[in-house]
Amino acid sequence: MYLDQIKTELLEAQDVLQKFIADENNIKLIQQAALLISDSFKQGGKVLSCGNGGSHCDAMHFAEELTGRYRENRPGYPAIAISDVSHLSCVSNDFGYDYVFSRYVEAVGKPGDVLFGLSTSGNSKNVLNAIQAAKQKDMKVIAMTGKDGGEMAGLADVEIRVPHFRYADRIQEIHIKVIHILMMLIEFEMAKDV
């Protein structure tokens, strides 16, 4: 009944992943992002993560595996997904949804911390505002984007971009794979100093 559609979906996902892997710069950027986060942790910093919709779920997933665990038993790492419902509803109501992440960064971000912002289009105004707030706090910024990077292109210290122009879910599939690789590399890097 749907066997052809299922196979087509899987093959398209495979194609997007193969194209991402074929660009050696993507591999280097993933390593750079993992080292940037690890260096922040080693200096007493933390990661704040944010995104909208599925990217919000990815931001929460990333923070959860830092504070909890990925594959190895180890100390928790300091990470916060900007996902507190009372904060989001307060700022949305009082200032507007464009400021839900930047207000949080302004409140708790410190020099040497890392903002991990996700936007498949690269145009999410609230993530862009968070990047600006992070820069003002002398934080490092890692952006995970898609398509042509949108307005976020060139704003981050490290931008990992999935140049897929059709559906956001394909971009998110690569984002979650990259998040899992980042977790693995961060655990490797942090274990060096134990």
UniProtKB/Swiss-Prot annotation:
Binding site for Zn(2+): H61, E65, Q172, H180
Cofactor: Zn(2+)
CDD domains in UniProt: SIS_GmhA (cd05006)
Listed transmembrane segments: none
GO cellular component, one term: cytoplasm
PROSITE patterns membership: SIS
Cofactor note text: Binds 1 zinc ion per subunit.
Binding site for substrate: N52, G53, G54, E65, N93, D94, S119, T120, S121, S124, Q172
Pathway: Carbohydrate biosynthesis; D-glycero-D-manno-heptose 7-phosphate biosynthesis; D-glycero-alpha-D-manno-heptose 7-phosphate and D-glycero-beta-D-manno-heptose 7-phosphate from sedoheptulose 7-phosphate: step 1/1
Catalysed reaction, written as an equation: 2 D-sedoheptulose 7-phosphate = D-glycero-alpha-D-manno-heptose 7-phosphate + D-glycero-beta-D-manno-heptose 7-phosphate
Annotated coiled-coil segments of the chain: none
UniProt KW Cytoplasm keyword: yes
Enzyme kind, highest EC tier: isomerase
Domain SIS: 37-194
GO molecular function: carbohydrate derivative binding; D-sedoheptulose 7-phosphate isomerase activity; zinc ion binding
EC number(s) on file: 5.3.1.28
Quaternary data: Homotetramer.
Stated role: Catalyzes the isomerization of sedoheptulose 7-phosphate in D-glycero-D-manno-heptose 7-phosphate.
Family: Belongs to the SIS family. GmhA subfamily.
Note: The reaction produces a racemic mixture of D-glycero-alpha-D-manno-heptose 7-phosphate and D-glycero-beta-D-manno-heptose 7-phosphate.
Protein's recorded name: Phosphoheptose isomerase
Originating organism: Actinobacillus succinogenes (strain ATCC 55618 / DSM 22257 / CCUG 43843 / 130Z)
Gene: gmhA
